Amino acid sequence: MSVKLKADEISSIIKERIENYNLSVDIEETGKVISVADGVANVYGLKNVMAGEMVEFETGEKGMALNLEESSVGIVVLGKSSSIKEGSSVKRLGKLLRVPVGDALIGRVVNALGEPIDAKGAIEATETRFIEEKAKGIMARKSVHEPLQTGIKAIDGLVPIGRGQRELIIGDRQTGKTTVAIDTIINQKGQDVICIYVAIGQKQSTVAQVVKKLEEYGAMDYTIVVNASASDAPALQYLAPYAGVTMGEYFRDNSRHALIIYDDLSKHAVAYREMSLILRRPPGREAYPGDVFYLHSRLLERASKLSDKLGAGSLTALPIIETQAGDVSAYIPTNVISITDGQIFLESDLFNSGIRPAINVGLSVSRVGGSAQIKAIKKVSGTLRLDLAQYRELQAFAQFASDLDESSRKQLERGQRMVEVLKQPPYSPLPVENQVIIIYAGSQGYLDDIPVSAVTKFEAELYPYIEAKYPEIFEQIRNKKALDKDIEEALSKALNEFKATFSAE
């Protein structure tokens, strides 16, 4: 039996096949390594590569295109460059760097690419985000108005921090900068704030100690640690803060609150300088490249308090800068001071004289935190800054003058006690209601007849006494967030009763 084929049927089938024919050809643009040194590869042949694009070397190492020149491309290697040789092939990946974000990262230690380095298995993240994002515009933001309590009396009373603020912690080495940051993380327990600690160029042992301390206080339950240590490639140290802020933005954009600590941006700038000089970019002041200001401004501008329309989430940044011999007028410190909303200045002289945290009250300032402070602490610490400044002035004068008048002597004695009140051991942040009570006691003269050496003992015994006899004082300050007449009367009564039973010995 013969099958008759109609010509029009055949032509329609052929036509359909031609129309549906899908020729997908994978065109991979590859290049060759001309030279490689110090974590930077010079590559020839990647004519269409974009700035910031990811590439892959034949050894499996990833890289990022940073310098686009006429005949070659400068690529920073994200990992070990020792296996890459001259003549190795490099292929474009056609994508920008992304890092995993979300709740799966909480409690983990990751590198600058978001890969786990804590031997606790893979991270099951459901979402990734670009590492470089544009900071939110003016209309997307809201002014800072909620407090972010650090648990440190000197900070919450004198240089308060609000959610969505950028507050710089600046000081010489060994002045307790990291301790202030860790105390702040520990104090966020139960506050529904996700913390991100970014370690840049630190020793592995130092980072291990920080993680151990956070675990000890149960803070790793709400903390992500991003580590690009001193032994990592400069490119990873450069990327670590951007990876951290990307993870923080996820929580901010989902109507949650996050806190990010960059420890520290001095080493970040040094890593960027190292990369830039190897890429042969022209050096500027202190051999830093011309765009080192933009390096930090685009990072810190990503911290913000979002408007109610966008969910009212917040991302607070606490960058750390290490100064050399207290020189805050160096290039990187002045840059970051001008970008942030205030600074907490730690001094080695204060630290060595036993005043810890070693905060210089005169030089420390919070430009927007005042509007975020709760009324109670604002009331009790209102004149504290002025009193301490006058005390410091009198103290300098008293070294030369032996006969002081009665009011000056009283001011000097109260100042000594207030300095004692503001001292605090590390890793012991105080709830805000406790801070209100002790600062009130100091500023209202309840400590004037207590020996200076007994102030710490007075404070340690005061809280349990009030908790046992007048628990409503704590509760009312916590709930009302203000110090009204009734609370003040009850507090005054409690302090007088406690003083009658207190023994300085």
Curated annotation (Swiss-Prot):
Gene Ontology cellular-component terms listed: plasma membrane; proton-transporting ATP synthase complex
Domain of life: Bacteria
Entries under Gene3D superfamilies matching the protein: 2.40.30.20, ATP synthase alpha/beta chain, C-terminal domain (1.20.150.20), P-loop containing nucleotide triphosphate hydrolases (3.40.50.300)
Pfam families, per the entry: ATP-synt_ab, ATP-synt_ab_C, ATP-synt_ab_N
Molecular-function GO terms, alphabetical: ADP binding; ATP binding; proton-transporting ATP synthase activity, rotational mechanism
Binding residues for ATP: 171-178
Name recorded for this polypeptide: ATP synthase subunit alpha
Gene (UniProt): atpA
